Amino acid sequence: MFCLRQLSPRKHHISFLLVLLLSLWLVEPLLAGPAIMPLSQVKPGMKGIGKSVFAGQSIQEFNVEIIGILENVQPKQNWILARLTGQGLENTGVVAGMSGSPVYIDGKIVGSVSFSYAFSKEAIAGITPIEEMLAIGGQKVPPRTGVSQPVNWLNMPATLEQLGSAYLNWSQQVGETASYDRSLVPIKVPLVFSGFSTRAFNSFKSILAGDNFQPVLGSRMAAGQTLNLSIPPPPAISEGQAVGVQLMGGDLDLTAVGTVTYVDGEKILAFGHSFYNLGTVDYGLTRAEILTVVPSLESSFKLATTGELIGRISQDRTTGVLGEIGRYPRYVPVNIEIQDNLIRKKQFKLKVVNDPILTPALLNAGLSTLIGAEERSYGNLSLDFEASFVLERGQIVHLEDLFSGNFDNPTTSLSSLVAAVSYLLNNNEFQPVKISQIDLKIRSVEEIRQASLEKVLLDKYAVAPGELVTARVYFRTFNNEVKTEEVEFTVPPLPAGSEVELVVAEAAYMQQLERSLYRVQDFTPRNIDQLLRLLSNLRKNNRIYFKLLASRPGLFLKGEEWPDVPPGYKAMLTSPRAATANLTEIDRSTLSEYQLPVPYVFKGAITVPIKIKK
């Protein structure tokens, strides 16, 4: 038989606290944000309000009338179709920058204004249901590592310039955008380019903007953020407020502007559709101020300025973005020095988001813009540079080269090269790599510095093994001056009567020669260390390369030449049982190599035979 027993005052107090804590835990999700109206309760004909900023930072209301429900417009996704009025929307239509504007019925949040029709005569919008946006916060996804499949455009590049060109051609193909007809599409997001020249803006807006964006040449707030790491306490954020998603900061700024849909403590939901739809990300979250709404037949848009950094965007999903106030992104700092005479130097600082896809594109746009602003965009130009990529684990990839030509070719070559190296590091197939810092020193002159090989003369053409030979190289500069350089080398100990060849050439010719020697068309690194060596050792434009070749069998394995392989070891490697991948038997081996720096982009190739005395 059960009987009641009176609890002691202490036990009664503990039990009461447990019940209270359990109750608070159960109701906490309901108290975290505004009340929600589920999609099942939304009916055609219902009327409500939306919130957005149309001028300044003041949140204003507009009218919303539900037209109907569009079910399964995308897998497991529904949209609410609505007509918007008020705040001039009858004349402007749905405005780019309204993405994320929250919609309320009977004081309960329904979702966010996210989609529209191009060239529509009325402000007809698609609303993303709030339940689908809230699902973003529940996704537990690890950060994107950048480890990916081998890059198919890296086909044994001969020079740094060719590597940059390969990336540029690939990125332009990737950047091609689709066209929309009469479908309901994401509302365009104003992407504000601050500090960019008109020419740079026109060059990069299609690559960086894509389908979901409205590129705008704008500016930051007068008291905008700096690169100072002492960030002030984050201010409060409200539903309907304008915010920015910052991709680049510093002397140039690239920030997209949208609207906050939902606030839950220090977390926010915004946009109601994807940004780039890259999943787990690390973008900046900033304040934004709307200057005005610019009416347009194609797509009216909010003209905005961006403000201080207040947090970060951590998720970029189909139904919106998730932001965290008070937590800040890990940017990649880029330090740039441009020198155009003996004493005049200018320093620039950028910070770009750390992303496998966006970082290279942002570096390309930022460097091209800064160099183009400081130096001539057209006419003769030569850029001599050094670049260092400092990695998180202490490794450094060092690049140096010279690009020379006219129009904007040198600038394009340099910026695309830095972008290419960033892409290869961030998207290597071996292990995650984080770039801690990029330092770039550029020296420019407004003239062409190119030279063509004329002839190569030796002090002797028949030599004894181990004898010293002097080679004099004659080349003609762009100004028709003939220059000479001398190099000394020692002939290896070879059998009497044999012959060696001295190849004097530019970088690109050396690649062609080695492809024919090794009978390979491409070379893919096998580990991260090999990739770092490949990038640091790529041949340069401003070098004269010397290679001594002899008819001596060897092996080419995993990107390296193995001369004088013992017969037994060679037989083991080349046997059918070994089946060693990427192994090539070669009949001519490299005895020695030299490179001579010159202040010109060097072109040409000559092969000189040398006899070994009996």
Where are these predicted regions, by residue range?
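N-terminal secretory signal peptides that target proteins for export/translocation
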Residues: 1-11
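Compositionally biased, intrinsically disordered low-complexity segments enriched
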Residues: 8, 14-15, 33
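Short linear motifs in intrinsically disordered/low-complexity regions
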Residues: 13-14, 107
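Bacterial N-terminal signal peptides
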Residues: 15-29
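Terminal presequence/propeptide segments associated with secretion/organelle targeting
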Residues: 31-614
